[in-house]
Amino acid sequence: MTLQQLVRPNILAMQPYTCARNEYSGEARAWLDANENSMISGLNRYPDPLQTEVKCRLAGIRGVDVANIFLGVGSDECIDITYRTFCRPGVDNVVAIEPTYGMYSVCAAINDVEYRPVLLHDDFSIDEEALFAAVDANTKVLWICSPNNPTGNAYPLEQLERIASRFEGITVVDEAYVDFSTIGSMVPRLQRLPRLIVMQTFSKAWAAAAMRLGIAYAHSDIIGIFNNVKYPYNINILTQREALKVLDAADEVARVAGSLVSERNRCLLYTSPSPR
């Protein structure tokens, strides 16, 4: 399917809201276009609706283009906007591995979308045939959390690419815990998988859960539609400022995550049953 066939018709047809900050990108000594109070400084101006500075920093760290990044109020907004963009209420369905992160099913219920869980194998690996057996003509999204919450295992990138290539809808790989995995990220594979969305977050390795900032990486056409669907100023200025400070510590975050992985492996070694 093409992206135009996957997106809800009303979303494709809508005229997106344009705010004052979208309509003028230059510099000015005075701003009168949004009825902001100019007598008090600090928090009186609307924030950048596209969070350009934060995205530029993320693009450099993850090796993608700014046009491939969407920022949401936590990953939960990224999850919800996926439903609102692609799934027709009362008509379409989604398929997800089970057990997994609970917000996929919660957002499905909120958006009146049928949720089809597919049990993992006993070793928590993906049952690909069962996964695709649950898919029908109205299946719009596959949800795969990797590393999976709550089982903790990450799935081989080759398997995830195979699934995303085979499925004709939108495949979402939720990488909230990717910084604690040795397998790596699906982000570098976005160029050859135009229907793939990769979600990440500031809440785990970045130790910034209070910011409520989630990330979706995808083809620029998907990101463009997300930007049309989202609320105009979804990421406030305080979050944007704090995110830039957090991103300054990228090297330290990588070091701490590596240390945690090393300690995790050591704990597993000492708590594993001894061979008999």
Segments from the language model and where they lie:
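PLP-dependent aminotransferase-like
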Residues: 88-144
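N-terminal "arm"/small-domain region of PLP-dependent enzymes with the aminotransferase-like
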Residues: 1-61
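Conserved small/polar residues in nucleotide/adenosyl-binding loops
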Residues: 270-276
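PLP-dependent aminotransferase class I/II
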Residues: 195-269
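Short glycine-rich anion-binding loops that position phosphate/pyrophosphate groups of nucleotides
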Residues: 35-37, 76, 101, 147-150, ...
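Phosphate-binding glycine-rich loop
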Residues: 55-93, 111
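Active-site pre-lysine segment of PLP-dependent enzymes
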Residues: 109, 126-137, 150-208
